[in-house]
């Protein structure tokens, strides 16, 4: 017989690997649905009590640790240099998620380039702070999804830029549709949201929220306080911004009822468009009310990026251009986005002048495929053909520069396959002792499929929408499963 002291407790790694994640997710989802139901019924006290139960449950703590330790940023440390890269560390971290004695550490400030050449500051929290934010986000998201504007599509589950663009099409495509568009952009939205407004209005643990808002950041060894804004890089920040802007659509609709105008709101994060039947309504009625709404929250409209445009002149939104041509609405990839993408691809090719062809193709293909997937729901066939041709020219120049003493015919046969009369850039690779050929992704062959927009009122925390969202997920998975083979073993 084995005595009790001879039986060792399972290690942290073994405990983590033995977790039934489906059961954990079901437990958390049940609580989230109860929170959403309480909000729909106006029982805010009950919702607050359920939030407390959720944030103190082991299931929610497990999910929070898994999210921050296994996502894309999990290998990027905060100021303490700590990362949870083993199962044992993840299991140990679960017990650290306590409200008692918690104090958020300053963020590690880094800078990433923006499209306009400027630098965007990002604040990287420590792992424990990320996990605490992820934990409280589990309790906050059911509320944000229940009260969010129906036609707001950024930073929300089951929603995408494609949904926002399809809503633009729906609002503008008909003959009698509104002809004027207010393109709105909120200036430095994440950096300027007022702390007091957040503390007074966000339905979450105020003490924890205050910690995250006022933790400050360290930049080049110096500590700086934060008097406004939410940290770009914090897991909970997008939802805080979403809740800050809740009510924009309701505001525009109330103005429309008073003026008798046709007005529609489409939002995505801090970008939005408002369609109106006249320029006067947008400029004189809508815009002043928007500015007052934002000012209350410490925000302002960007004068550079906020315009009122006629639909016949077109407007850019989320990298797309929407414009009517002889009364017909066409939504295409924006010219600036196409040129920017090609510039980046040419730079990538130019910087890797000496690497093996197969390695270059492996770098290019995911970028081409991702860009095509983003735009394949709009009128993009001609654009895809143009991008494909420009890629051919860039890779031809790359091939010629590698062999200045060789003839064009020799270069063509070395780097390009003739497939049914079409020259395709290709390379060779060796894997497990076998040779194979890898081809450039043919963006011109990407099929155009109209995106089916999510229903505006759909809520993943309402059982009523469960069947609809599951069916939509299956359909979208099927739509995304088209495949153009690019690697073949011989």
Which residues fall in each region the model found?
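Right-hand nucleic-acid polymerase module
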Residues: 348-409
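A conserved non-catalytic segment of reverse transcriptases
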Residues: 297-363, 367-371
């Amino acid at each position: 017989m084995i005595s009790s002291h001879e039986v060792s407790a399972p290690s942290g790694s073994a405990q983590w690997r033995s977790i039934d994640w489906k059961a954990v997710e079901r437990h958390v989802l049940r609580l989230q649905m109860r929170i959403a139901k309480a909000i729909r019924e106006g029982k805010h006290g009950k919702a607050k009590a359920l939030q407390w139960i959720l944030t103190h449950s082991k299931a929610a703590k497990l999910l929070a640790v898994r999210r921050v330790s296994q996502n894309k940023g999990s290998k990027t440390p905060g100021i303490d240099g700590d990362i949870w890269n083993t199962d044992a560390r993840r299991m140990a971290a679960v017990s650290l998620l306590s409200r008692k004695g918690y104090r958020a550490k300053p963020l590690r400030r880094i800078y990433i380039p923006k499209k306009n050449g400027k630098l965007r500051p990002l604040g990287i929290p420590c792992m424990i702070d990320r996990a605490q934010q992820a934990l409280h986000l589990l309790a906050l998201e059911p509320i944000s999804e229940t009260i969010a504007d129906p036609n707001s599509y950024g930073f929300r589950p089951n929603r995408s830029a494609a949904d926002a663009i399809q809503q633009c099409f729906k609002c503008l495509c008909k003959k009698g549709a509104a002809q004027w568009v207010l393109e709105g952009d909120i200036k430095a939205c994440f950096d300027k949201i007022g702390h007091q407004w957040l503390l007074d209005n966000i339905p979450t643990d105020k003490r924890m929220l205050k910690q995250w808002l006022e933790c400050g950041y360290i930049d080049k060894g110096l500590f700086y306080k934060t008097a406004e804004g939410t940290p770009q890089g914090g897991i909970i920040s997008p939802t805080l911004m979403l809740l800050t802007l809740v009510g924009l659509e309701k505001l525009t609709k109330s103005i429309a009822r008073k003026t008798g105008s046709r007005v529609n709101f489409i939002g995505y994060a801090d970008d939005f468009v408002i369609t109106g039947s006249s320029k006067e309504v947008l400029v004189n009625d809508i815009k002043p009310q928007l500015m007052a709404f934002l000012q209350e929250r410490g925000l302002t409209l960007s004068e550079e990026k906020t315009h009122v445009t006629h639909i016949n002149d077109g407007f850019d939104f989320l990298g797309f251009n929407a414009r009517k041509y002889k009364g017909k609405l066409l939504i295409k990839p924006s010219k600036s986005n196409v040129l920017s993408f090609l510039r980046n691809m040419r730079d990538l090719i130019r910087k890797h002048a000496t690497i093996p062809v197969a390695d270059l193709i492996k770098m290019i293909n995911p970028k081409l495929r991702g860009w095509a997937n983003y735009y394949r729901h709009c009128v993009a066939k001609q654009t895809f053909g143009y991008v494909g041709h420009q890629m051919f020219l860039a890779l031809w120049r790359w091939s010629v520069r590698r062999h200045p003493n060789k003839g064009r015919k020799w270069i063509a046969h070395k780097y390009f396959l003739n497939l049914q009369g079409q020259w395709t850039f290709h390379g060779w690779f060796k894997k497990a002792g076998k040779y194979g050929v890898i081809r450039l992704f043919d963006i011109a062959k990407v099929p155009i499929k109209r995106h089916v927009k999510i229903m505006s009122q759909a809520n993943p925390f309402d059982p009523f929408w469960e069947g609809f969202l599951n069916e939509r997920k299956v359909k979208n998975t099927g739509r995304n499963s088209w495949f153009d083979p690019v690697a073949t073993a011989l």
